[in-house]
Amino acid sequence: MSELLLPPEHRYAKIIKERHNEDGSELSVLNLGPTHPATHGIFQNILLMDGERILEAEPTIGYIHRAFEKIAENRPFYQITPLTDRMNYCSSPINNMGWWMTLEKLLGIEVPKRAQYLRVIVMELARITDHIICNSILGVDTGAYTGFLYVFQFREKIYEIYEEICGARLTTNMGRIGGFERDWSPEAFRKLDKFLEEFPPAWKEFENLFERNRIFLDRTVNVGGITAEKAMAYGFTGPNLRAAGVDYDVRVAHPYSSYEDFDFIVPVGKSGDTYDRFCVRNAEVWESLSIIRQALEKMPAGNEYHAEVPDYYLPPKEDVYNSMESLIYHFKIVMGEVPVPVSEIYHAVEGGNGELGFYLATDGSRTPYRLHFRRPCFIYYQAFPEMIKGALLSDAIIILSSLNVIAGELDA
């Protein structure tokens, strides 16, 4: 049997024996996960340790694999949206909008400018939520619990905005082909204005708690670094790539949903270490706030919140209950009886943790012929073993946290 097919414990046994014979080192094998609280999800890493230092690492994935891509091949297009919610659930509206935009690209549907701006606001709120979670949890892993408690109240305020828009909080299933299911209420805009007023001072204090904190700096500077060349070789995108010094953002390189209408800076780091990843996400929160304000200022007048495409757009529920025509359209669309061309496309959006891509191939039937999700977490986790070699066990936890690997997206 090839050594590569042996379990890590067996392969490591040979290394342990050789090292013990050479210099008397007492090496050990440690299972980190799959149900360890420090890993923030169902991850397993089998580590070869020399004391507290990691010599080798091998990840095991698939503990919560749900075969999303195969399930999608047997579902009508509208019924796939809930699957996207359950990948990176920290920023699920971005996943929803990415999927709708993929279908709109396939069908050649032009979304009204106002609906595009509303989507931008939702996606930037989701990005803020994602970065709040990632950076505050990184603080917890370095021993600073205060920041986590301080900013998590604002995640709740964003969830209240989601609730006002679509009725859901975490797995939002937000939007429709062509726009939104309903126009935003005045209460949604009021809550958004209140968030934009209250959150910036709190985020500034959060930054001050960490960016000049000597203990935090000691735990994160020059820890888990990766070069720009290595990051690109692995296929890094998002904050993890930009922290390594590469200026690439899907919103700028391939604008969608009218992102070209907004002025914002793409924050870029230098060393690609844990501290740079933290700082890039902090800076991106400020840019997201700026984009939201610009979208509100430039919002077109009127109440256009969806494209006029009755063959694809689900009618409002009140119409379904009171109109036979709306009921028929609702049934046809949900059950997949909609005209779809034979085609294949790829569409990507800038997710909370990197480029989230959708490759969709259709054969004209009511379900996709093939659907592939480009999941940034899957790529980061491949680099994780190399990034923690030679690091201390306590540093490995921090490095994983700074990469923002979400188990639901990793395994899909």
Swiss-Prot record:
Q: Which organism is it from?
A: Flavobacterium johnsoniae (strain ATCC 17061 / DSM 2064 / JCM 8514 / BCRC 14874 / CCUG 350202 / NBRC 14942 / NCIMB 11054 / UW101) (Cytophaga johnsonae)
Protein's UniProt keywords contain tRNA processing: no
Tell me the gene name.
nuoD
Molecular function (GO) terms listed?
Answer: NAD binding; NADH:ubiquinone reductase (non-electrogenic) activity; quinone binding
Put simply, this protein is called NADH-quinone oxidoreductase subunit D
Q: What is its EC number?
A: 7.1.1.-
Entry keywords, A to Z: Cell inner membrane, Cell membrane, Membrane, NAD, Quinone, Translocase, Transport
The record's subcellular locations are: Cell inner membrane
Q: What does this protein do?
A: NDH-1 shuttles electrons from NADH, via FMN and iron-sulfur (Fe-S) centers, to quinones in the respiratory chain. The immediate electron acceptor for the enzyme in this species is believed to be a menaquinone. Couples the redox reaction to proton translocation (for every two electrons transferred, four hydrogen ions are translocated across the cytoplasmic membrane), and thus conserves the redox energy in a proton gradient.
